[in-house]
């Protein structure tokens, strides 16, 4: 019997990291924990393998790579990798999934539409690697229609052949033609504001604070660094908003209603320096962040989105959660750097004695 390769997010949990990738597994885990996550489904790494092995993709890739020679550590060879990436991605995206896979992907999308109560709902197709490498692969927003969902899943798969990913594999001595990932197909939130929050102050490592960053529109503006976000510092215990830094945001990442494309558009003058979040939203996000940290048992880096059409607080959604990495790593290094008295004694005992001659 073929291995299962597609799941509703609500079926998943942390234990499924290796099956569907960390992003999908964490979304499912948050659903199980009672957090508000947009409905969606996940294609597993097995789906990637099926696509690569049951279509001509792998055979064509290997043939192409036979003649490819470049040094990943030589900057002058970067153009070779860029050309290879472009050629390979075009190749991958031009080949359709096996017919039974495409049919199933579309059926799951139709069920999402039924749940939402309307046809052709917009979704995001998001990459989900078994190991968390934020920004390594690609995400596509506002994808509507079953055919477009199937096409954009292939685009996510093809992003494993973007230039930086190929170079990274070459440097590690890994096969260039193979890097299985999962894909999340997640219902889009019609975001009036979005961003990221940390259950530790990323500036100084203070674990008694939550830091929320946000901007108007979709969160990609904040995650990508294209907009300087507003920043809110909140005490975890008292829920007091201790600091507000409101930036001149300039633009927002939003849907163009005419072209149906996502784009940056200039904010009206009265919104550029206006806070993107209300106080009640800041406090609600802080409460949620604390619960996510408790649920996962470690400091968290969380992406949120606030709906323009749903009432508060039902419109506050989480679209990503992962362990905070910077201060957790520093804390680990600090602990590893401390030696016990017994360790110091053994170190002294086995230190070679220097003898002058």
Residue positions per predicted region:
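N-terminal beta-alpha lobe that positions the nucleotide/phosphoryl donor
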Residues: 1-181, 193, 273, 277-280, ...
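Short loop/turn segments at secondary-structure transitions that flank enzyme active sites
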Residues: 131, 191, 218, 324-327
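NTP-handling and nucleic-acid-processing catalytic cores
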Residues: 140-238
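Conserved catalytic alpha/beta cores of large enzymes that bind or transform nucleotide phosphates
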Residues: 209, 214-301, 306-310, 338-357
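Short, function-defining helix-loop hinge/capping sites that tune catalysis or transport
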Residues: 48, 143, 209, 233, ...
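Cytochrome P450 core scaffold surrounding the K-helix E-X-X-R motif
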Residues: 220-224, 327-333
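Short beta->alpha transition motifs characteristic of CBS
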Residues: 214, 319-326
